[in-house]
């Protein structure tokens, strides 16, 4: 039967990571549990909600864990309650002892807490991914790609393919990440170094958001595997599995205008433009159509927003450069604010075709690697 002692902080950190995959709203009751597997070489914590699964391995020689294993086995414990109990234990070291009928005794200092466990045999078998070709990437790079795209996914479940980020390896040796909710789009291209893994998949936005909390060391390299309907992200101790969204993602390249189609090219200070949109949004949230109007006439660039109930906003913008024709176009300022949040460059380039065609945003001096697209709103 299981028996081990471990540093509470190291164990608690592993619990926190694993619990990212455990939800309360699951169709299989066993998936509200945490599975603990103890072997001579270490402890594995397993959590899953059916869509995301995490295996977190604490090796016995982990210096921070100060682990001593006296007995092996496996058990299921109520995840949320167990995490709360561990966090309240008084001493730095905790002892975990399995008793009869899967009861667990936690000892820390003068505290003893008994928990009712369950046989691990009732836990669903997690689908394994066969290790074949893989792609290695730094956590920091993956997080950047996800941040630059995931905000544009749809929240409407009636079109599932748009609730995830489309990831595709291209014949040009690049990774393409793209997301759209049909009102806006964000696309990122990243050169890859000799990747053997070829794929065309849709990764759910919920998996992406959890990924950021699971892999916290931005400088480490992780390995990516894909098999059937699953994607695996793995480092030395954590295996993070995600189900993929079924379906074919539309060709978004056709949405990006040709260079010759643009009739107006503007460059702004990104921070100034965002602050202007923030002020305009104060009024647009009070209106039914929620739009701001951008009017370009000669050297003048003006934003306006009106609310019959509240008032109006009129602000002149300074364009760092302007090439092309005059234009008046209306759009949702929320979309532009979201787009500017993920652009790190100090200056942003915005190009227009007409007042009824989508316009594009890019960091200034950026080539085709990162482009965003926003659809205007037709107003009377």
UniProtKB/Swiss-Prot annotation:
Main location (coarse class): cytoplasm
SMART domains: POL3Bc
Alphabetical list of InterPro entries matching this protein: DNA_clamp_sf, DNA_polIII_beta, DNA_polIII_beta_C, DNA_polIII_beta_cen, DNA_polIII_beta_N
UniProt subcellular location: Cytoplasm
Family annotation (SUPFAM superfamilies): DNA clamp
Pfam families attached to this UniProt entry: DNA_pol3_beta (PF00712), DNA_pol3_beta_2 (PF02767), DNA_pol3_beta_3 (PF02768)
One GO molecular-function entry: DNA binding
UniProt cross-references to PANTHER family, sorted A to Z: BETA SLIDING CLAMP, DNA POLYMERASE III SUBUNIT BETA
Subunit organization: Forms a ring-shaped head-to-tail homodimer around DNA which binds and tethers DNA polymerases and other proteins to the DNA. The DNA replisome complex has a single clamp-loading complex (3 tau and 1 each of delta, delta', psi and chi subunits) which binds 3 Pol III cores (1 core on the leading strand and 2 on the lagging strand) each with a beta sliding clamp dimer. Additional proteins in the replisome are other copies of gamma, psi and chi, Ssb, DNA helicase and RNA primase.
Name the record gives this protein: Beta sliding clamp
């Amino acid at each position: 039967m299981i028996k081990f002692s471990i540093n509470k902080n190291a164990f608690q950190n592993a619990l926190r990571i694993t619990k990212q995959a455990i939800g309360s709203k699951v169709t299989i009751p066993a998936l509200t549990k945490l599975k603990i597997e103890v072997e001579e070489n270490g402890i594995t914590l397993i959590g899953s909600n059916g869509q995301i699964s995490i295996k977190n391995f604490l090796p016995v020689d982990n210096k921070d864990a100060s682990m001593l294993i006296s007995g092996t086995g496996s058990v299921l414990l109520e995840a949320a309650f167990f995490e709360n109990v561990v966090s309240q234990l008084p001493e730095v070291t905790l002892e975990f002892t399995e008793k009869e009928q899967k009861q667990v005794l936690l000892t820390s200092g003068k505290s003893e807490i008994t928990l009712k466990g369950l046989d691990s045999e009732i836990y669903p078998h997690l689908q394994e991914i066969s290790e074949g070709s893989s792609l290695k990437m730094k956590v920091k790079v993956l997080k950047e790609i996800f941040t630059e795209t995931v905000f544009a996914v749809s929240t409407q479940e009636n079109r599932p393919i748009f609730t995830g980020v489309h990831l595709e390896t291209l014949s040009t040796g690049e990774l393409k990440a793209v997301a759209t909710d049909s009102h806006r789009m964000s696309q990122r291209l990243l050169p890859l170094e000799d990747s053997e893994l070829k794929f065309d998949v849709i990764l759910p936005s919920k998996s992406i958001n959890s990924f950021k909390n699971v892999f916290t060391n931005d400088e480490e390299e992780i390995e990516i595997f894909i098999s059937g309907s699953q994607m695996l992200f793995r480092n030395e101790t954590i295996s993070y599995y995600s189900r993929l969204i079924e379906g074919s993602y539309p060709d978004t390249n056709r949405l990006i205008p040709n260079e010759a189609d643009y009739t107006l090219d503007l460059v702004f200070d990104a921070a100034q433009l965002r602050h202007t949109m923030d002020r305009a949004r104060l009024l647009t949230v009070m209106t039914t159509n929620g739009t701001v109007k951008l009017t370009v006439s000669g050297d003048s660039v003006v934003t306006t927003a009106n609310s019959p109930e509240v008032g109006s906003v009129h602000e002149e913008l300074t364009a760092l450069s302007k090439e092309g024709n005059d234009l008046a176009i209306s759009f949702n300022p929320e979309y532009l604010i979201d787009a500017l949040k993920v652009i790190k460059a100090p200056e942003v380039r915005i190009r227009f075709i007409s007042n009824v065609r989508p316009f594009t945003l890019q960091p200034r001096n950026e080539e085709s690697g990162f482009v965003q697209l926003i659809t205007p709103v037709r107003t009377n």
